[in-house]
Amino acid sequence: MMDRRGFLKNATLVSAACLMDFREALAWGAKDAEVGKAWKGWKKGQFQIHLIYTGVSESMFLIFPDGTTMLLDCGDHNAVGRGKLAVPVLPNPDRHAGEWISRYVRRVNPQKDYVDYMMLTHYHSDHGGNNKFYARKETRDGKDYYLSGFSQAAEYLTFGKAFDRCWPDYNDPLPLTQEAADAFEHMKDFYDYMLAHKKMEIEKFCLGETNQIAMKKDATAYPGFSVRNICANGRIADKEGNIRDLYAERKKSNPVKFSENGMSLGMIFTYGDFKFYTAGDFSDGWELPNGKRFEIEDAIADVVEPAVSYTHLRAHET
């Protein structure tokens, strides 16, 4: 059994094997003849992962080998309100994150402004936006509509389908009325609007599936590519599809809420020998009856094969 420390060590070693040393990587980049030239774009057969950093939002844009695309998270929150903990809004504060992200996507996307999939990993504002910090407030369908995160990006991008952890009932494993209330109200309004006016499909994320997030254009040409859904709503799935509920014992006490981070959606993208793991802010922990500390990251380490790892919380802590 691999513990969390071992898992993170393996992930770090994989990354280090690719990049060696951060300073050395920068040196390599400085010597690269392509530096400063226009980006050549995506080519068929490439699996590209674009980590989009704005300082106030988690966001990732993925281009599958056949050209299928996905925007994973697109948030916004009041960075200045964090005081001494505030970080700069990038590339500058003239625009909100949703617009910056959509501008970037339109530049690198082989389909320009059309994105096949969008996914909110969990209901926190820095991953999806909220109704308290926004670029603009409008009246749509007789009620307030806030352009923040995904809803702002959707003003510039067209999404074909959304994957969500608990749509349409918003009660898996508990009703989204406590910890995630702000982001929940925002995303529900966004989903309702997109269903009514933009013909976007919405589908609940299916834990354990390996074909839900599928290539849409030429899947048979790339049999070595797959996306395996490994965590959702406090549960994890191994390669055989066996599901373990990490919160099963805690549910017996009839709690009113769980940590939203622990509900994060997670996947392993596989392309040949390359594997990439990402799972929003997947993290939580509590003391067991025997006095030992249980961390859900330890549990997911058992179902994650050696892979390049990207999680928002780990990036901030290291």
Please annotate each region the language model reported.
Residues 74-98, 132-142, 289-293:
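Acidic/histidine-rich helix-loop elements
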Residues 6-30:
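N-terminal export signals
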Residues 118-128, 314:
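Histidine-centered catalytic micro-motifs
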